[in-house]
Amino acid sequence: MRAPEFWHKDGFAARLLEPVGLVYAALTRHRVARPPGVRLGIPVVCVGNLTAGGAGKTPVALAVMDALRRRGVVGHFLSRGYGGKMEGPVAVDPVGHGPEDVGDEPLLLANSAPCWVSRNRASGGLVAEGAGAQAVVMDDGHQNPSLAKDLSLVVVDGGYGFGNGRYIPAGPLRESIEAGLARAGAVILIGSDSENLAARIPPHLKAGVPLLTARLEPGPEAARLVGRKVVAFAGIGRPEKFFATLTALGARVVARHPFADHYPYAEADIQPILDEAYGLGAVPVTTSKDAVRLPPDQRPQVDVVGVRVVFDEPLAFEALIDRLILGRLPS
């Protein structure tokens, strides 16, 4: 689904749904309050957020894995596999599996490191450890206590913040801001801070918990689009962020097509976009997360732009990995 407008700007619909949201929040509060879950013999870092929709979790998870790799640590990803039908635990095969099997994010992550899909996070973590993982990076799961975490990174979109401050479905919040931030080992604020979050977040953090600022930048492959006309489409949490990124790098976005997050593309969805791009003399462009959901025959006809997270203080991020992740590794 696409996030409704009232999730960001409060209105009558949000107030009408508030009672349902309070029930959702109570259920989450009850789940999070369960006793600590299974503790692995290896470090577990969770990359999560407090809201539904895209905040930049996947690029951060990839950055964590890259930091582990540079330290000689064998890391495995662990995902619930949202949108896929397989319950797992199962190792993601980028060639043999499709998004209908394991979801889109695991397919993207599996191109970087071994990735496991498991509805039961504890079972997935145990299988990863048994398969040789020296650390586990969880994609999402901040509100899931079944697997004990050594570090919880809470990712926040600086341009969206916490929306209207209400709970799903009245707003985007999965749980209360105070409770979610209290469990954070660090907060990563991504993008322009239009919500004054750098001042609003720290009072809710435990002493010594850092707030890191970062931005998303397109990969080097985006350079070929500078000055060219593009027809852009995306089915992510906030498609407009992708369109703005293309404009900022110098591409001429002549048409844009937003789809719902995790949208399962069919050939009938993509062909009109390809035809439009051809008619305009433009390049059809989408995100790397969308690319894994494209019909195989049409995938080669679409240009793909990935993004990476760039920290404003990279040494602070590196220190976080050293202190909170590698400290649990056997010497």
Curated annotation (Swiss-Prot):
ATP binds at T51, A52, G53, G54, A55, G56, K57, T58. Pathway: Glycolipid biosynthesis; lipid IV(A) biosynthesis; lipid IV(A) from (3R)-3-hydroxytetradecanoyl-[acyl-carrier-protein] and UDP-N-acetyl-alpha-D-glucosamine: step 6/6. The keyword Ribonucleoprotein does not apply. Keywords: ATP-binding, Kinase, Lipid A biosynthesis, Lipid biosynthesis, Lipid metabolism, Nucleotide-binding, Transferase. InterPro entries: LpxK, P-loop_NTPase. It catalyses: a lipid A disaccharide + ATP = a lipid IVA + ADP + H(+). Its EC number is 2.7.1.130. GO terms for biological process: lipid A biosynthetic process; lipopolysaccharide core region biosynthetic process. Transmembrane segments: none annotated. GO terms for molecular function: ATP binding; tetraacyldisaccharide 4'-kinase activity. It comes from the Bacteria. It is an enzyme of class 2 (transferase). GO terms for cellular component: plasma membrane. Transfers the gamma-phosphate of ATP to the 4'-position of a tetraacyldisaccharide 1-phosphate intermediate (termed DS-1-P) to form tetraacyldisaccharide 1,4'-bis-phosphate (lipid IVA). This is Tetraacyldisaccharide 4'-kinase. It comes from Rhodospirillum rubrum (strain ATCC 11170 / ATH 1.1.1 / DSM 467 / LMG 4362 / NCIMB 8255 / S1). The gene is lpxK.
